From Swiss-Prot:
Keywords: Cell projection, Cilium, Cytoplasm, Cytoskeleton, Disulfide bond, Dynein, Electron transport, Flagellum, Microtubule, Motor protein, Redox-active center, Transport. Residues 2-116 form the Thioredoxin domain. GO terms for cellular component: cytoplasm; dynein complex; microtubule; motile cilium. This is Dynein 16 kDa light chain, flagellar outer arm. Gene3D superfamilies: Glutaredoxin. InterPro entries: Thioredoxin-like_sf, Thioredoxin_CS, Thioredoxin_domain, TXND_domain-containing.
Amino acid sequence: MAAGLPPVQYSIDTDADLETRLAGKGLKVVEIFSEWCGPCKSVLPTFRRIRLDKDDENALLFLTVCAEKCNFLETAKEHRGKSEPLFLLYRNGQLKARIEGANTPALNQQVLSLTPANADVDDLEENPMYLAKMERERIARGETVKDAKGAKKGKK
């Protein structure tokens, strides 16, 4: 493998990191695994091949999340203690597919059909996770809805 290539998968260790990744553009393949099992190794060659075929590295990200350490996704909490991985495919912050187990053909088909050619085709204003994150940040800064709307108008 050539030097300088991005990793195939990113390990997500915090709920904040997961939220930030899902609030972005492009397809995010989130593997939920049990702590005692670890991430699924059988799907890595498929993920590597698909990832290397993409020109825009932001159009597709593979993420691994330990079910026992994740509180951000209700689905992750429900998956605790299970032996098979669960794959959740998010496009522009919206759940598009759910694949249980290491079903490589189904993963391959779904990833290829859902991955945009370029992440810029997604609109963050249509990403519910992005909008929720921005709202929480606005509230944390003590801004009102009126302040946020005024700031938006000033940018145009």
